[in-house]
């Protein structure tokens, strides 16, 4: 009723970070593109994105542990927010700027709160400070905990960190090359060359961490067949180098490829890009499957393109996408939902955006300059590098 509306209106006008959709009115042009997004009743044009202050970092951990869930037996601890690297596909790396590693003393106090839980997972977009990670791992070992990571940077595997990981009994490490070719890694601003990646996997094997998981994406902007084939070539090269070490140890681990379809995300330099079509993604997956079919000790897992399409629809659409959600719930099928709703989902998923197009997420105040994201997109098309964030020094993106 009117009482509830008035209360929401009052809260939205006073509290940063509060978005009430009914108080913002979208307008569309003849082509169906968003042309305006206006607040009503005097509310701010932009809704500020709230960030976690360092003092609240102690709250960034698993609160409820329940069985029969993905991490039901593992206590997850966030070790920082944001990332300095600037990978152009990564939403978390941009929307959580500036990068903020949590103080070690706070993380150690959270570890103490894990109680009798044996397994601890360290989570973060950027796990880069090898010295800090080494000390945190030693603290976990001292308290009798098993440790795992979301992934580790190939250029951060120091001998000291590797020795600590071995002591911790780690059997598997995940590294994310993300693209197979040097060129495409420059496009996405990954900042890792092939030599660094291969040498990192060799060092892991030398320290008896023999199981390796590699993250790759297909469908990245400017990707050609040669870039997809490079995933196969890089995997074979890594295996060849590891095999020489494993022969001396008389045991071989497993290399597992996790291959996901690239989905263009809001607030990244690739927010203007059209998603690759499903048939193309399926063909690229086949290239990798066939290329590694006869490689022993190499396993491949693939994202399902049709579900990546759903993810892109939800990520890139505006409030009209709610009609697809309702139809999918009613029919029990996304395929039926696409037919039932009088909108073409390709409009949101497969359409390249115009330079000055208004996006449904532009009203969120992340502090990032949209022109900066466009400049990064243009640098991507030229495969040009951007240096990592220099917090408090550089002013390039507008956040600091």
Where are these regions (language model features)?
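Acidic, low-complexity intrinsically disordered segments
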Residues: 1-105, 324-330, 334-364, 368-379
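Glycine-rich beta-alpha loop elements in corrinoid/cobalamin-binding modules
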Residues: 1-38, 266-318, 325-333
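A glycine-rich phosphate-binding loop feature that marks nucleotide/adenosyl-phosphate handling sites
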Residues: 10-22, 125-130, 152-157, 217-219, ...
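Structured core elements
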Residues: 19, 57-59, 65-66, 75-82, ...
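Glycine- and acidic
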Residues: 72-76, 88-97, 117-123, 180-187, ...
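Conserved SAM/AdoMet-binding glycine-rich loop
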Residues: 108-256
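Short glycine/threonine-rich loop-to-helix capping motif typified by GTGT followed
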Residues: 130-136, 162, 222-231, 266-277, ...
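C-terminal amphipathic alpha-helical interaction region
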Residues: 363, 382-400
């Amino acid at each position: 009723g009117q009482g509830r509306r008035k209360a929401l209106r009052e809260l939205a006008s006073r509290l940063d970070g509060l978005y009430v959709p009914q108080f913002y009115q979208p307008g569309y042009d003849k082509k169906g593109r968003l042309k305006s997004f206006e607040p009503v009743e005097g509310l701010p044009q932009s809704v500020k994105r709230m960030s976690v202050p360092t003092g609240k970092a102690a709250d960034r951990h698993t609160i409820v542990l329940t069985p029969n869930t993905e991490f039901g037996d593992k206590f997850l601890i966030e070790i920082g927010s944001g990332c300095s690297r600037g990978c152009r596909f990564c939403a978390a790396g941009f929307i959580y700027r500036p990068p903020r590693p949590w103080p070690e003393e706070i993380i150690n106090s959270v570890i103490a709160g894990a109680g009798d839980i044996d397994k601890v997972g360290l989570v973060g977009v950027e796990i880069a400070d090898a010295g800090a990670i080494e000390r945190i791992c030693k603290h976990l070992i001292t308290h009798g905990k098993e440790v795992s990571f979301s992934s580790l940077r190939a250029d951060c595997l120091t001998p000291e960190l590797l020795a600590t990981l071995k002591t911790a009994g780690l059997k598997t490490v995940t590294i994310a090359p993300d693209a197979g070719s040097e060129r495409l890694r420059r496009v996405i601003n990954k900042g890792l060359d092939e030599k660094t990646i291969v040498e990192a996997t060799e060092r892991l094997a030398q320290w008896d961490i023999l199981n390796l998981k590699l993250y790759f994406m297909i469908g990245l902007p400017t990707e050609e067949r040669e870039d997809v084939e490079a995933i196969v070539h890089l995997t074979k090269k890594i295996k060849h180098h590891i095999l020489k070490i494993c022969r001396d140890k008389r045991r071989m681990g497993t290399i597992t490829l996790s291959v996901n379809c690239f989905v263009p995300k809001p607030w990244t330099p690739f927010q203007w890009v059209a998603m690759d079509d499903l048939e193309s993604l399926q063909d690229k997956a086949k290239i990798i499957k066939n290329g590694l079919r006869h490689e022993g000790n190499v396993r491949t897992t693939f994202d399902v393109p049709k579900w990546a399409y759903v993810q892109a629809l939800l990520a890139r659409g505006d409030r009209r996408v709610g009609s697809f959600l309702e139809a999918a719930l009613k029919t029990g099928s996304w395929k039926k939902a696409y037919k039932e709703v009088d909108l073409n989902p390709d409009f949101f998923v497969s359409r390249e955006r115009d330079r000055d197009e208004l996006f449904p997420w532009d009203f969120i105040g992340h502090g990032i300059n949209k022109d900066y994201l466009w400049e990064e997109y243009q640098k991507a098309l030229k495969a040009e590098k951007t240096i990592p964030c220099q917090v408090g020094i550089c002013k390039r993106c507008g956040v600091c």
